[in-house]
Amino acid sequence: MSAHGDRLYFRQFLSGRDFGVADQLAQQMVNFVYAIGDRQTGECVLVDPAYDPAALVDAVAADGMRVVGALASHYHADHIGGSIFGHDIAGIAQLLEHADVPIHVQADEVPWIERSAGVGSGHLMAHASGDVLAVGELTIELIHTPGHTPGSQCFLVHDPAGGKLVSGDTLFLDGCGRTDLPGSDPAQMLASLRRLHRVPDEVVLYPGHRYSPADSAPMAAVKANNWVFDQI
């Protein structure tokens, strides 16, 4: 049973603006972190909690929510912590210092996350595509969308109001994730985009970076305006 619309807790945080304000890399990378939960039970999960996990835990606590897990869209350091461009980024390893919670990852991404984020498999909960995670009475479907990385995944939040798709670096409002990085695969990306093209039009897309003036858009608009769907 999905949480009713008034129970859904959903917050979008922009790195360098809403947290990590003094972090120049956080400002440059414009990552989005999401908090998704059930207001009635007070449980929530964080999607891609990088840069300042403690601040994110505090932010949701101020809303009366407690973190019961984290979701990793993929292994890159700007999403889950690690080293990038010669900088060390806090992430899921530091989150575990503040909240001893499971980190939900796609099974194919486990070895990449272990290497990049410094978190052992004992803290990682591996999932297959189609798995459904319950947060209170809210349900989140985990969708394997390889291409940017082998175990990239998107999160479909079931909501009577129409649903939300948190897409990490698989799909942006304009464009898609790069396919020229370690573990990337252009053919898999095309297959993943075809899969996401089947997401209902009324679902709202929430990407992993603010690469467009808007922070989100209905899938109908994304399908109509994003050039990546011209080849679908």
Predicted feature locations:
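Hydrophobic residues in well-ordered beta-strands that form the structural core
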Residues: 47, 103-107, 167, 207
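Short catalytic-loop micro-motif centered on adjacent basic/acidic residues
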Residues: 43-47, 142-144
